[in-house]
């Protein structure tokens, strides 16, 4: 189809100056996020009948939705219905497991401000009912993963509330936690640590 200007001249798209996109350097796809790595790990455990662990959905109240096409709805505004508890829960060897996944770019410590009071209270309740609660912490700069039992997280949280430091040092995590081995399948083998810490 030929397009013409009002004066009769033909529109030639090639004569228009081309806009060159500005290149921005991003490293966001360099590595997977902790959540993606755990989802992949949990899928491996489920597929191989090792454990049944899933990411908890975040309950949202949808307020505004746009329908640009009949088959496509876009959520424009939503609110959390209630504070979420922890990220993952499931069953392993007949025991309920519940854990939170956290990442930090810090080299020497993990800030406790990454936790919320309702998450700490939830972990306390899981432990009180003989469930297994823990946190998986990733130090992204070192690509290191640690499993830290809820009792230690609760102790460090209480220390903070009584005037102590507002973070957990990496040395404390190394002392009280367990370094997780990483591989191809499963990506983060936290079940192996559960076997030694909780089932031996």
UniProtKB/Swiss-Prot annotation:
One of its GO terms (cellular component) is cytoplasm. InterPro entries: Resolv_RecU (IPR004612), Restrct_endonuc-II-like (IPR011335), tRNA_endonuc-like_dom_sf (IPR011856). The record marks 102 as: Transition state stabilizer. It comes from the Bacteria. Mg(2+) binds at residues 85, 87, 100, 119. Endonuclease that resolves Holliday junction intermediates in genetic recombination. Cleaves mobile four-strand junctions by introducing symmetrical nicks in paired strands. Promotes annealing of linear ssDNA with homologous dsDNA. Required for DNA repair, homologous recombination and chromosome segregation. This is Holliday junction resolvase RecU. It comes from Bacillus cereus (strain G9842). The gene is recU.
């Amino acid at each position: 189809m030929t397009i013409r200007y009002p004066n009769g001249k033909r529109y030639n798209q090639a004569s228009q100056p081309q806009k060159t996109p500005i290149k921005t350097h991003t490293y966001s796809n360099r590595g997977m996020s902790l959540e993606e790595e755990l989802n992949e790990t949990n899928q491996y455990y489920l597929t191989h009948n090792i454990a049944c662990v899933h990411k908890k959905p975040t309950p949202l109240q949808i307020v505004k939705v746009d329908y640009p096409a009949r088959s496509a709805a876009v959520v424009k505004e939503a609110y959390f219905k209630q504070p979420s508890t922890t990220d993952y829960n499931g069953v392993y060897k007949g025991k309920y497991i519940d854990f939170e996944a956290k990442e930090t770019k810090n080299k020497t410590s993990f800030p406790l401000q990454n936790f919320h009071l309702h998450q700490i209270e939830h972990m306390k309740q899981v432990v009180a009912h003989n469930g297994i609660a823990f946190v998986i912490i990733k130090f992204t700069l070192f690509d290191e993963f640690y499993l830290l039992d809820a009792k230690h997280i609760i102790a460090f949280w209480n220390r903070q509330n009584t005037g102590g430091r507002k973070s957990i040092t990496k040395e404390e995590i190394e002392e009280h936690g367990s370094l997780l081995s990483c591989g191809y399948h499963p990506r983060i083998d936290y079940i192996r640590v559960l076997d030694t810490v909780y089932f031996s």
